[in-house]
């Protein structure tokens, strides 16, 4: 049985640790419990689920199969939209509880890899301006990462779902695809005191292209970020960043808002 200090939230906002059991079977691992689920590049999902995951390695190819349950009280990308007919009301696509996925990653060379993930959410409830309906939603993700030089890496990934026909607060269709790219100098490691990383990323991430992506501030945002990670003591990371951009879809009847975070 394993657990770690990263926490998630269960029913009624009770804080719980990730906790799971795992067993090795040759070059494969079976994990059962509550654990962090991560698509190939974290564009579809990077959050905790309760279920089972089977991972394997075969030379330069690795992959995983997952089935689990998510907390269903939140929306895709954590995004809700004001109802133009009544701004006191909001609507969005609320998560189904069942999630399944298959992902693959292949090392093209010692410095370059490609990856892809297929994911499926059952019974997503779309509450659009008082008209509710349920549907299963499929997600796809593909990307690559490469080492350009010593201590300099580049990654880029694209994700898309088949949830369409939903409009935002100003009547535009909610975007169901998105892409994310990042250039990073060095890598910080929480166990390596003094390690650091400098990064910049640019993205255009539609709200319906992700369940819960790595770096929440990238969801439903078109723009760029400049940041810095530093490890002052073991298991402690300080991150400072500035991000700027605009919403991909308007969550307010006043239109798309600018996004500036420091």
Report each predicted region and the residues it spans:
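Outer membrane beta-barrel
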Residues: 1-79, 96-116, 175, 179-212
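Surface-exposed intrinsically disordered loops and tails
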Residues: 3-7, 87, 168
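Outer-membrane beta-barrel pore domains
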Residues: 8-11, 111, 118, 122, ...
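Alpha-helix capping and helix-loop boundary segments enriched in small/acidic/polar residues
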Residues: 8-9, 42, 89-92, 131-132
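A short, terminal or domain-edge coil/loop segment
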Residues: 45-57, 87, 103, 247-261
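Short, low-complexity, polar/charged sequence segments that are solvent-exposed and flexible
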Residues: 49-53, 82-85, 217-221
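Intrinsically disordered, low-complexity Ser/Thr- and acidic-rich flexible linkers and loops
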Residues: 77-91
């Amino acid at each position: 049985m394993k657990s770690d200090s990263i926490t998630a939230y269960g029913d009624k906002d009770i804080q719980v640790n990730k906790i799971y059991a795992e067993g090795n079977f040759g070059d494969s691992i079976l994990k059962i419990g509550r654990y962090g689920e991560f698509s190939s590049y974290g564009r579809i999902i990077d959050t905790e689920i309760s279920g089972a995951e089977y991972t394997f390695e075969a030379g330069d190819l690795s992959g995983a199969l997952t089935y689990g349950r998510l907390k269903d009280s939140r929306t895709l990308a954590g995004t809700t939209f004001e109802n133009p007919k009544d701004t006191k009301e909001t609507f969005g696509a609320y998560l189904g509880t069942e999630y399944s996925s298959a992902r693959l990653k292949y090392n093209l060379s010692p410095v370059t890899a490609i990856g892809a993930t297929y994911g499926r959410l059952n019974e997503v409830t779309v509450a659009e301006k008082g008209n509710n309906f349920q549907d299963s939603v499929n997600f796809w993700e593909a990307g690559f990462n490469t080492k350009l030089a010593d201590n300099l890496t580049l990654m880029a990934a694209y994700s898309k779902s088949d949830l369409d026909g939903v409009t935002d607060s100003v009547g535009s269709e909610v975007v169901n695809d998105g892409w994310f790219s990042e250039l990073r100098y060095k890598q910080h490691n929480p166990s390596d005191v003094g390690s650091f990383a400098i990064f910049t990323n640019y993205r255009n991430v539609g709200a319906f292209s992700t369940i819960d992506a790595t770096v929440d501030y990238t969801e439903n945002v078109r723009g760029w970020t400049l940041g810095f990670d530093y490890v002052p003591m073991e298991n402690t990371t300080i991150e400072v960043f500035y991000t700027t951009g605009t919403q991909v879809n308007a969550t307010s009847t006043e239109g798309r808002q600018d996004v500036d975070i420091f």
